[in-house]
């Protein structure tokens, strides 16, 4: 190829002008760059899909409306998450011109957790997590149990098959949301879920949400493999669990809780014979591995309390 022709071709390929700026509509951006939304397309990202849906159910529990969450790995490696919360709203969202349920599952940055009315505490974001899971699934179906009716909508690669419709009746007492999704094998490196990975995460979630019952079932095996997590003691039981292979220096877990300026705080601790620090901090049930002012404040207060006691009892000069 002549030098002039080569230079002309390279110039065209490297051209960067106004027309090279792409506009990705709807959930297209999620499929184009999934790592921006779920971290990766490896096994870690695959399991993150489950956490996104579960976190939405947990937020209902944190708001005081959900007591039970059931997570099932189906025989075809799809996932079903069902909760007994209030159920995602199904009425018409007048701004979007469609059902609120469809908005939640098809529009990024749409949900009930951006303002102060729907949720005072939340770890997930309806309309971010839910719509991302939908975008990265070949199929997703959602059922909402509300006001004695069962509402349903199904999607393929993030797009609704038809508008939200009523598919049946349920008891007036039944309420909640049931979601089933099939991860897209063209997006993820693997689509086989690891039971132990989900078990570890769901156990931790149950510890952090006092009184919440979470059931994990693996329907890929016969008989179905099931674990139930329910901890009335919450993070007190979490500390006991973390210390089970160590020798505690005193029998009772120290626990305190309180609210100041509208912020609720729980602390549980129990020293053991290890020299390694094992302090875990969470905000709205989401672990904060890098710490933050909440952890720094706790450590400062703990140090100050120990020093004050030690000086008062002439242990520390």
Q: Model regions: which residues?
A:
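GHKL-type ATPase core
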Residues: 2-19, 77-100, 111-241
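Bergerat-fold GHKL ATPase/HATPase_c domain
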Residues: 2-54, 103-105
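Flexible hinge/switch segments at interdomain interfaces of large molecular machines
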Residues: 23-31, 74-75, 170-180, 269-283
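Flexible beta-alpha connector loops of hexameric P-loop NTPases
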Residues: 37-44, 89-95, 188, 287-290
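Short, conserved non-catalytic motifs in the polymerase core
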Residues: 38-40, 118-120, 125, 279-289
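Conserved ATP-binding N-box helix of the HATPase_c
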Residues: 44-67, 129-136
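A conserved short beta-strand within the histidine kinase catalytic ATPase domain
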Residues: 67-73
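GHKL/Histidine-kinase-like ATPase module
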Residues: 163-166, 196, 203-205, 211, ...
